[in-house]
Amino acid sequence: CVGLGYWLLGNDTPQTTFVSGGISIEPGTTKAVLVFNSGQQVKLTDSIAFEQAIEKFKPSGQVEQAIEYNKIIVPRGGEYNLVLADGTSVMINSDSKLSVPDRFEGKERRVRLEGEALFHVAQDVEHPFIVETDGGDVTVLGTVFNVNAYSGEDYVQTTLVEGRVAFQGKGMTDARTIAPGE
């Protein structure tokens, strides 16, 4: 919910340190690590954006073949905003990992999440957007939503801001469509 509020208010709000019972609570900072399929790692900061890192560190002269998945790892106390190749914007929360393809091809757009992220999905009715988690898959039907799927938790929580999503838990045969307020 904190990430959702931050996303809705925008990234230009002043950073504030909260004090509770003598303990300082610092706001999250923009930090993440991009791990390429090859294992090479690049620290993502304000000065090195996700898109720049992909272009800068992509091996030159290589013919594009199979889709490669890169992983964005956001450590505790961090957060990271990025825009995917299809125009979908994602705010990845603290202690989370998002695996994304170097390009979207085929009938669907699929990413894998461990942790929490807020998605503002670029609408494309011909190519559904799917967030895969350990607990199940969230299929987006053009929307803004948050997914909370941390490792070790017994649940996957989806908070819908607008639009609709369909959730199909692991081992379930049918998906359940969810609208705001449900």
Range-by-range predicted roles:
Residues C1-Y155, A166-E182:
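Short acidic/polar, Gly/Pro-enriched loop/turn segments located at secondary-structure boundaries
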